[in-house]
Amino acid sequence: MANVEAQTGELIEKLITVNRVAKVVKGGRIFSFTALTVVGDGKGKVGFGYGKAREVPAAIQKAMEKARRNMVTVQLKGDTLQHPVKGRHSGSQVYMQPASEGTGIIAGGAMRAVLEVSGVHNVLSKAYGSTNPINVVRATIKALNGMKSPEQVAAKRGLRVDEILG
């Protein structure tokens, strides 16, 4: 679907997909719309929202509000990832690895939008299995959330940071 981008204050909002759904009742079908959006500050905070309403603008507005409420902080290393990560949700699997300066965001569809709003500028990624946008977004955010900085790993293992990094 169209990738609509808006900036409100310091937050970057992206519309990933809008879908028309139908509820079948005795008198026929009742149509409504769903919207999937991601919101981030470009500095490591990202959230997604899924809204549903009878009209498209209302669905988008609901999704944006949910995305702002469900933001998580991601530990970035400059403008790339700390280390390679995998994420899984339902039938979707994602793999992301840090890339050198100037690589850009090598990602498709819904994963690209999540990485752009979270502040990642150099990454190599691949989605496996189902490419359902909702599941890909959830898997991507789970993977980013599971990423740990060397300081966190060192503290957990009871070692110094230079011992972790080699």
UniProtKB/Swiss-Prot annotation:
Gene Ontology molecular-function annotations: rRNA binding; structural constituent of ribosome
Which domain of life, per UniProt? Bacteria
Q: Which UniProt keywords apply?
A: Ribonucleoprotein, Ribosomal protein, RNA-binding, rRNA-binding
Example GO biological process term? translation
Membrane-spanning parts? none
Q: Which SUPFAM superfamilies match?
A: dsRNA-binding domain-like, Ribosomal protein S5 domain 2-like
Q: Name one GO cellular component term.
A: small ribosomal subunit
S5 DRBM domain ranges (all copies): 11-74
Q: How does it assemble?
A: Part of the 30S ribosomal subunit. Contacts proteins S4 and S8.
Q: What does this protein do?
A: With S4 and S12 plays an important role in translational accuracy.
Entry note about domains: The N-terminal domain interacts with the head of the 30S subunit; the C-terminal domain interacts with the body and contacts protein S4. The interaction surface between S4 and S5 is involved in control of translational fidelity.
What does the similarity note say? Belongs to the universal ribosomal protein uS5 family.
HAMAP family in the cross-refs = Ribosomal_uS5_B
> What is the designated name of this protein?
Small ribosomal subunit protein uS5
Annotated organism of origin: Idiomarina loihiensis (strain ATCC BAA-735 / DSM 15497 / L2-TR)
